[in-house]
């Protein structure tokens, strides 16, 4: 396939590098200074758990109208979504356009002016960019999520990722999945901000971990009561009221491990505008009531994280 990557942070770099290694022709939408480095060095990703490194060449294009593509992978932060969509209005033909990141508004947040077949998804990795290389790890509990659809381009994407060792799940209600996941992420990052963005500090702070888990449970319950479906099963189980102590223990262990930094803290510090926006959207959606008192306590009093 001819693939265009819009957004070359960790996610765009990792998935773009693997798609190139799988034999697909990868182009990258220009966004200096990052794409200046890509034009020279290509896309490079390193699995920090295995040490495996993948490199692929990529063509940097000045705008979305510069070529015809089968698949467009939009890997931008939620606060960059509107500007990314504006850049994509010049796409030629009818590509599959996969929005691949935090987006609690779901399909309704994507303007009709974006050409092609719009789909939703979410990555199954976390990591950091270091000197142009994306150091990453796969999240075993969260496979790459792709909208359940008959679009053959998403089927080819799934095949390519599976060949590259990625676990992939197809999600019927991707809109709901993204709403619940955004609520979860907003709570976790707010807890991290209370601890200066330091996952080790959060791991040792049981009152904040307990507040975080209470807030996640409340937000899930409020979304469910408002008619939102699509709650990921693993999160539904872990954050059921009966397993509160288990959830606190689980997140203490996770935050004290390398996963705390790779999967949560690094992005929380780097993308504070996005995380704040998720918290504001969640508060606006659920309101402030006794049923979400712990959620309000967590989100409304979270201080800025340390750089």
PLM feature spans:
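N-terminal glycine-rich dinucleotide-binding loop that anchors FAD/FMN and/or NAD(P) in oxidoreductases
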Residues: 43-60, 185
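Rossmann-fold dinucleotide-binding core
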Residues: 103-181
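Short phosphate-binding/catalytic loops that engage adenosine nucleotides
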Residues: 24, 166, 228
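NAD(P)+-binding Rossmann beta1-loop-alpha1 motif at the extreme N-terminus of oxidoreductases
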Residues: 1-51
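Active-site-proximal catalytic alpha-helix in oxidoreductases
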Residues: 175-203, 207-220
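A non-catalytic, amphipathic alpha-helix used as a structural packing/dimerization or gating element
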Residues: 156, 160, 210-225, 277
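Rossmann-like NAD(P)(H) cofactor-binding subdomain of soluble oxidoreductases
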Residues: 52-134
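NAD(P)-dependent Rossmann-like dehydrogenase/reductase catalytic/cofactor-binding core
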Residues: 224-307
